[in-house]
């Protein structure tokens, strides 16, 4: 990917901002166990903010603001920034950084673990994401009652490529199929290790995630439950995934729940596990997916499978 155009961003990054960033990234001892790798390149930071296309009326959620190198740029464009930060030291430095400036009234800092924090309404999410919460963060955003219009997220390069992978790609996995059902994902830029302090061990990428509107009319837990089974070994046949004793026990339990909800009695003389196996075989045969591999299947294949299972009372959550 081409390097950021310095002329494009030079007007948005002041000498004062650059000096503040250099100071803050030089005095802190960062906790890499918390994924603290501060983005120090002002051109990359400005490029990320510009890609969010922030409106003056927008509320922006920032996850892991650190010392505020992205935050101060977001504050210039947004109505309000809600920053979720786990490290009290970082929160204190960010507070000091905006103290006495017009941006101070526009910043709200929520101190705590993002995954355990109840989020307020927001229009956009921007994050230099701590890599250990990459997947949980994506699914928390997707499952918001009112999901953001757009999310601009920095991830470990391989994780970003998994989000973008298509059927047949080596990196195509449950994450790929799951996220792409609910959102459109595009790659924005690569970010090298030397753009961070301290440098991480891996390269990074920035992606844009836009939640589909309207949302697909399927239950998230049902969809996710099916994918968890078929992607256990993505290069094995789909039928192989349904032969696991654990899977059969889960489906049997769910089937009993389905019957109870629909006021249908269980035939005590019938071997329920044999019935479940028979239903699975029938569905896989009729859909023509028994011998296909999950790593080669697309959304249409999985939707066909999910619908067929539901038709015979087999559920995944």
Curated annotation (Swiss-Prot):
GO terms for molecular function: 18S rRNA (adenine(1779)-N(6)/adenine(1780)-N(6))-dimethyltransferase activity; RNA binding. S-adenosyl-L-methionine binds at residues 37, 39, 64, 85, 113, 128. Keywords: Methyltransferase, RNA-binding, rRNA processing, S-adenosyl-L-methionine, Transferase. InterPro entries: KsgA/Erm (IPR001737), rRNA_Ade_Mease_Trfase_CS (IPR020596), rRNA_Ade_methylase_Trfase_N (IPR020598), rRNA_adenine_dimethylase (IPR011530), SAM-dependent_MTases_sf (IPR029063). Pfam families: RrnaAD (PF00398). It catalyses: adenosine(1779)/adenosine(1780) in 18S rRNA + 4 S-adenosyl-L-methionine = N(6)-dimethyladenosine(1779)/N(6)-dimethyladenosine(1780) in 18S rRNA + 4 S-adenosyl-L-homocysteine + 4 H(+). GO terms for biological process: maturation of SSU-rRNA from tricistronic rRNA transcript (SSU-rRNA, 5.8S rRNA, LSU-rRNA). GO terms for cellular component: nucleolus; preribosome, small subunit precursor. SUPFAM superfamilies: S-adenosyl-L-methionine-dependent methyltransferases (SSF53335). Specifically dimethylates two adjacent adenosines in the loop of a conserved hairpin near the 3'-end of 18S rRNA in the 40S particle. PANTHER family: DIMETHYLADENOSINE TRANSFERASE, DIMETHYLADENOSINE TRANSFERASE-RELATED. Belongs to the class I-like SAM-binding methyltransferase superfamily. rRNA adenine N(6)-methyltransferase family. This is Dimethyladenosine transferase. It comes from Candida glabrata (strain ATCC 2001 / BCRC 20586 / JCM 3761 / NBRC 0622 / NRRL Y-65 / CBS 138). The gene is DIM1.
